[in-house]
Amino acid sequence: MATQYGITGTTAKGIAASVERAVTEGSLGPEAALPPVRRLADDLGVSPGTVATAYKELRRRGIVVTRGRGGTVVAPAPAVTSRRPPKVPEGLRDLSGGHPDPSLLPALVPPSRLSPGVRAHRSMPRLARLEEVVRDWIGPEGVPVEHVTFAHGALDLIGRLLSVELRPGDAVAMEDPGYHHLLDLVTALGLRIVPVAVDDEGLRPDAVRGALRAGVRALVCSPRAQNPYGGCFSAARREALLEVLRAEPDVLVVENDHASEVSGAPLRSLTGDGLTRWVHVRTVSKFLGTDLRWAAAACDATTLARHDGRLLLTSGWVSHLLQEIVHGLLTDVATRALVTAAQETYALRRGALLAELGGRGIDAHGASGMNLWVPVQDESAVVNGLRSYGWWVAAGARFRSSSPPGVRISVAALAPADAARLASDFAAVLGESEATYGG
């Protein structure tokens, strides 16, 4: 029979499937309360143990969470839904995407000739000359490069590592606010997110210490160009974080240096300085093009073996054609000059909007990268208000776990000449919002 909650089923599997279907379809939204075990058991005519088993399976899969006396509720970002942004309305200036400016990307031209002969893809999955380039790229910035591997992008690599290292129900420390696709990925793997607060210098050491006390088995962070907040590790913050992390040598530290060359900040890596388990991940999508689904990683020996062992059982290797293209671009003098120009351009655009907002008394954060985070009282009011002025920005809800509200503005394609108008419109919207919602 169906209950007032729309839940049906006579077996644990059937009940769990019914709840999952309701969450997927939206009839049970994020943080909606599920009925107590005994009440649902009575309504369905089954034993409490059957309902408890269904709830346990739903928790394992990241669809619901238990809040002590607060009962069982749908997860804030359930694994069967997505934090994908809404479609951009026609006629608006889109500052929500976080993508690089296409005019600052090189042309992607396939190599004119591939080396002849049969390639031993499984025995030699990585081009030796690309490995050498990667070591020369990452090593001088202080990351140990004895062990290097490749993957089909940062999310692919991080997801593979977490699935090998952790089990459903394990806890992962994640930046808050943080990159929404990573948050979705962790939830989809059935892992529990432990939010870690960030500021302009990245992860806060006190918040990391709290996450370690909560029993996290991995920590995922960005050393610079933190998305969406824009923070980057200072030298002092790096040392403070290492002091905290060295106390838990079994925790895997995953460093996602996604913007590297165009972040506008130096790398202060947590890797290779007393940590036992670590991986430093880099992609090229922000400065060579989003179609290049390739990532390089430097890591400890154990992490390398576990990652490559799982990769071998799935896709096996990253396309050598793709590796050839990446190698060609990373070693091309003209491309390197374009990347340098892109980094300078993004820094100029980011600084221009920060200055214009600050000049109007609007607090904003963006020490590095392509995004600004602006704290607000009401995300919907600000997003819709800016829409009326012709701008489309990202509501912060999809980036947040427990942090205060805000909006993300991508500055990658925002010319400095437009920054003043956006800041003026933002100030007007904030004034209207405070008048409407009581300040």
What kind of region is each of these model predictions?
Residues 1-119, 132, 312-318, 330, ...:
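N-terminal basic, amphipathic alpha-helical segments
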Residues 51, 95, 134, 148, ...:
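Generic structural signal for small/hydrophobic residues in well-ordered secondary structure
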Residues 64, 171, 192, 252, ...:
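Residue-level detector of anion-binding/catalytic polar loops
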Residues 100, 223-226, 286, 414:
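Short glycine-rich anion-binding loops that position phosphate/pyrophosphate groups of nucleotides
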Residues 119-249, 261-274, 434:
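Conserved core of the PLP fold type I
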Residues 280-343:
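Conserved core segment of the aminotransferase class I/II
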Residues 343-354, 362-375:
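Conserved glycine-rich beta-strand-loop-beta hairpin in the small C-terminal domain of fold type I
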